[in-house]
UniProtKB/Swiss-Prot annotation:
Catalytically driven reaction(s): a quinone + NADH + 5 H(+)(in) = a quinol + NAD(+) + 4 H(+)(out)
Protein name: NADH-quinone oxidoreductase subunit B
CC per GO annotation: plasma membrane; respiratory chain complex I
Quaternary state and interactors: NDH-1 is composed of 13 different subunits. Subunits NuoB, CD, E, F, and G constitute the peripheral sector of the complex.
Organism this protein belongs to: Enterobacter sp. (strain 638)
Residues the record lists as binding [4Fe-4S] cluster: C67, C68, C133, C162
Length: 224
């Protein structure tokens, strides 16, 4: 089977991604102001219930590319117990999963396969890029490695590290849950706006900037 790789253009109107209209807004709830009190409250309650179910039942697709996958699987052990976040149900088929974790080095031969698997996932679906290699190619700045999986699929959460610890993966799940809780997706094909609205989430680097600048006493790794 021949595979073709399509480069993603976030600003492209006719690009293959997203298949639905997506728009980054400061607060999706601001659109509820122009609605009536009753319908606005009812639709808001329905969105809260649907998003609560989605963010607490994230089913990841079980596949890995490199050493970061080992750290991802470690989070499923009893020591870390990722079942607390509702993400312990590994799926062997992309059609039954709603989360793709690209863990490890993405080679150019594997990129079309990942893109095809992403296309086979049903909406709503999310992507976590785990590790420096998946984020930006890592130390492999060569012709055979894709310099970031966001070159061909959209990414929701980036996990830095080489490799990241299981705790970093669980923190990424919590960040993804916060983002899913603020999303506004169509409740039905006949109910409300058919667009997909995602909140503009603040990066962890910006959120912790003030805390890091205020540090005056640098501790050794043994004291942390």
């Amino acid at each position: 089977m021949d595979y073709t790789l399509t480069r993603i253009d976030p600003n492209g109107e006719n690009d293959r991604y997203p298949l639905q209209k997506q728009e980054i807004v400061t607060d999706p709830l601001e659109q509820e102001i122009n609605k009536s009190v009753y319908m606005g409250k009812l639709e808001h309650a329905m969105h809260d219930m649907v998003n609560w179910g989605r963010k607490n039942s994230i089913w990841p697709y079980n596949f890995g590319l490199s050493c970061c996958y080992v750290e991802m699987v470690t989070s499923f052990t009893a020591v870390h117990d990722v079942a607390r976040f509702g993400a312990e149900v590994l799926r062997a088929s992309p059609r039954q999963a709603d989360l793709m974790v690209v863990a490890g080095t993405c080679f150019t031969k594997m990129a079309p396969v990942i893109q095809r698997l992403y296309d086979q996932m049903l909406e709503p679906k999310w992507v976590i890029s785990m590790g420096a290699c998946a984020n930006s190619g890592g130390m492999y700045d060569i012709y055979s490695v894709v310099q970031g999986v966001d070159k061909f699929i959209p990414v929701d959460v980036y996990i830095p590290g080489c490799p990241p610890r299981p705790e970093a993966y669980m923190q990424a799940l919590m960040l993804l849950q916060d983002s899913i809780g603020k999303e506004r997706r169509p409740l039905s094909w006949v109910v409300g706006d058919q667009g997909v609205y995602r909140a503009n989430m603040q990066s962890e680097r910006e959120r912790k900037r003030g805390e890091r600048i205020a540090v005056t006493n640098l501790r050794t790794p043994d004291e942390i």
